Amino acid sequence: GRLGALSPGQVLRRLDDRFRLLAGGDRTALPRHRTLRTAIGWSHELCTPPERLLWARLSVFSGPFDLEAAEYVCSGDGLAAEDVLDVLSALLAQSVLTREESPAGVRYRMLDTVRAYGADWLEATGDADRLRRRHRDWYVGLATWCELEWFSPRQDEVAARVDAELPNLRSALEHCLDEPDGAHLGQYLAGALWFHWVGCGRLSEGRHWLEQAVRLEAEPTAGEQSRLKALWVLAHVAILQGDTVPALAALQECRREAERSANPAAVAYAEHRTGCLALVTDDLPRAETLLRSALHRYREIGELNSNVLMGQVELAMARAFQGDLPDAVRLCEDVRQVCEDHGERWARGYALYVLAYAAWSEGDPVRARELLADCLGGAHRFRDQLGSVLAVELLALVTVAEGDAAEAAVLQGVAGRMWPSVGLPLFGSAHYNAPHELCEAAAREQLGDERYVECVRHGARLGRREAVAR
């Protein structure tokens, strides 16, 4: 309707104010149908005062939300927590809200236009800042719970919950980082979500939030520990992306400040991630020294979680690259047992990867394939891009060893398509790259260059689910 007067570009720029743009409709229609604002306003007028109040307050949610979140964030000052369910049900009956099922349970959602109308009313009440703080506090609490429960049998539930809550977690992060006194909360929230950035395929987004968080100056007493955690998590993400220079800078700052403030946990994490950096840059003796020291520090302070187990897996990888396969197997079997005792599935997948590497190195491709299939299934369930692509890379080598060079080349094409969403392929590491080069050389020899390239291109065209199923 507006294209007679405006270009598509002008329409796009004006869509931020949908109520101003979408006005002046069919003059033969009822007055309440002629503009978007009066159409929504008609529904608003039909609501009771408590319904209008809840509508306005629910506008602070940036995506789907559950009942518990609505009760916490929106109650008080004229709306008791025990009344939220009844008022919310009335808004559902009037289609102000919609109800949806998700892997994280029953959720509620507002259409963006309905939400924008409520947000205008919330601003008019003068209560918007308080509601945004309550929204922030709820999601900081949710992230705290999810980080603790990641190391438990509820790992799948946690992954689904954070995925469903991501729009609201982003909104909470924005609020923390925009508020003058919210820097320490932003650093805390960005760091607490490490398992999602690293374990659920969100490396680039995690890097975005963490870099913003560590640039902010927080109150020393309130934010020191949160800043240290944000620094080592930022370094972890950058290492996995193959970006070693900013990773090293963050780790050096973290270690220096952790020692100054006598924070043994932050020292251990900084040392652990420095060992991980040495591993992916092929300095294996230094990696082994640092990782053993970090694991000793973890034991001294009683730390046991998925990060600690990953440190042991990384130590096993360093031992395997140096030729000590029995020690690598011992370390990863221990991790596997701890994971089974605690219901941990994510770190277990990386232990299976190292065990598969050892099985292939010892000439047992059948055992290696069995372990890698298990590893890949778990990584795919969590959407862990790094775990998935490492498993596919090694599966390609196992496949060529079993005599199917064409399928091995297809799998290399699959891996080639996956690496850009992670970072630098195989971290730029000669040791991690060795299986890829062995596979490529064997496949090219058996297929010829032209057929090899054709198979790689076929693999690169496969979607993620199709590739994993294959």
Which functions belong to the PLM regions below?
Residues 146-161, 382-385, 420-438:
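Acidic, Ser/Thr-rich low-complexity linear motifs
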Residues 406-470:
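C-terminal non-catalytic interaction modules
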Residues 176, 197, 217-218, 238, ...:
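Eukaryotic all-alpha helical interaction scaffolds
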Residues 187-201, 226-244, 265-283, 294, ...:
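Tandem amphipathic alpha-helical repeat scaffolds
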Residues 1-215, 386, 392-394, 398-410, ...:
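Aliphatic-rich helical/repeat scaffold segments used for oligomerization and domain docking
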Residues 89, 170, 174-177, 211, ...:
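Alpha-solenoid helical repeat scaffolds
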Residues 179-181, 219-222, 256-264, 296-304, ...:
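Short coil/turn linkers that connect adjacent helices within long alpha-helical scaffolds
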